[in-house]
């Protein structure tokens, strides 16, 4: 009966997979599976794939003010982020790995489907009127979870990137304040509370942590080779290098590549200097130029 609330899944699941990695003791993986099965039995809504915060909030015993199922955003954020961290460390041949993969994917699908048009998720995710307005901690955890899934090949970028774009727009332009603080974070709690004020001044350390978690994963996404606009940068390199190289080849460097400088440039009284000022530029271009020629447009540029 250890894992009876959603926060606990984030707190303990990743620790168990880390302990397995450190010790090699398979007991940690056995108990990981045993305990999550227990958690599912008391707080997983199998119809939606979402988690209730704990057994007190299971429908129909508990309902929102509109009579709907009440799924707490930060609670499901803990779970999605926790599953991402677990998958990172689970061995490829673990007998229950597909169980965790399917759980993660289904939860991601369920969460993405109920995003608000403004990019955030409300505190009660399936009933925006119950406690209306944005909530940052849950939104940030979801954003991290989606980005991790794309970065590691579990989620379809074409499906989830639009969701991430809207969520990050909210996080970067609304949640992040001009003074660097992270607002719209629901205080410590366990449910969406009608009438509770959550505004730009509402801050909490777990909101900041979730924001940073999402931001770091977004940087990893942006730094992935397939997301770099190689064609743009290669074209820019070509435009910088071509005039220099063509004049060098024709022996016209000093004639055609004069550069005006300050009279006291480098301590020397010169009106012009030759290619000295292009040295660093060309040093930066050189690694690209040394790549082999090929039949691509980029290869022909180098040729």
Question: In which residue ranges do the predicted regions lie?
Answer:
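Membrane helical hairpin/interfacial module
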Residues: 265-303
């Amino acid at each position: 009966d250890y894992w009876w609330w959603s926060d606990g899944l984030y707190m303990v699941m990743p620790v168990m997979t880390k302990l397995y990695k450190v010790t090699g003791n398979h007991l940690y993986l056995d108990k990981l599976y045993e305990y999550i099965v227990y958690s599912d039995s008391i707080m997983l809504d199998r119809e939606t794939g979402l988690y209730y915060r704990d057994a007190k909030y299971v429908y129909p015993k508990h309902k929102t003010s509109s009579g709907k199922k009440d799924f707490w955003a930060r609670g499901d954020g803990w779970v999605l982020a926790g599953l991402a961290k677990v998958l990172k460390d689970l061995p490829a041949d673990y007998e229950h790995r597909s169980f965790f993969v399917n759980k993660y994917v289904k939860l991601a699908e369920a969460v993405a489907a109920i995003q608000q048009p403004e990019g955030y998720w409300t505190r009660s995710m399936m009933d925006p009127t119950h406690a209306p307005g944005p909530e940052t901690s849950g939104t940030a955890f979801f954003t991290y979870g989606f980005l991790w899934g794309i970065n590691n090949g579990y989620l379809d970028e074409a499906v989830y990137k639009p969701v991430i774009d809207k969520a990050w727009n909210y996080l970067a332009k609304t949640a992040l304040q001009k003074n660097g603080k992270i607002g719209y974070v629901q205080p410590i709690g366990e449910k969406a509370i009608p009438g509770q004020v959550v505004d730009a001044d509402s801050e909490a350390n777990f909101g900041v942590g979730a924001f940073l978690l999402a931001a770091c994963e977004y940087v990893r996404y942006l730094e992935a080779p397939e997301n770099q606009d190689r064609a743009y940068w290669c074209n820019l390199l070509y435009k910088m290098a071509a005039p220099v190289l063509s004049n060098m080849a024709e022996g016209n460097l000093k004639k055609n590549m004069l550069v005006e400088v300050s009279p006291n440039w480098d301590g020397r009284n010169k009106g012009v200097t030759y290619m000295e000022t292009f040295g660093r530029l060309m040093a930066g271009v050189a690694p690209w130029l040394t790549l082999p020629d090929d039949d691509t447009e980029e290869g022909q540029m180098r040729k």
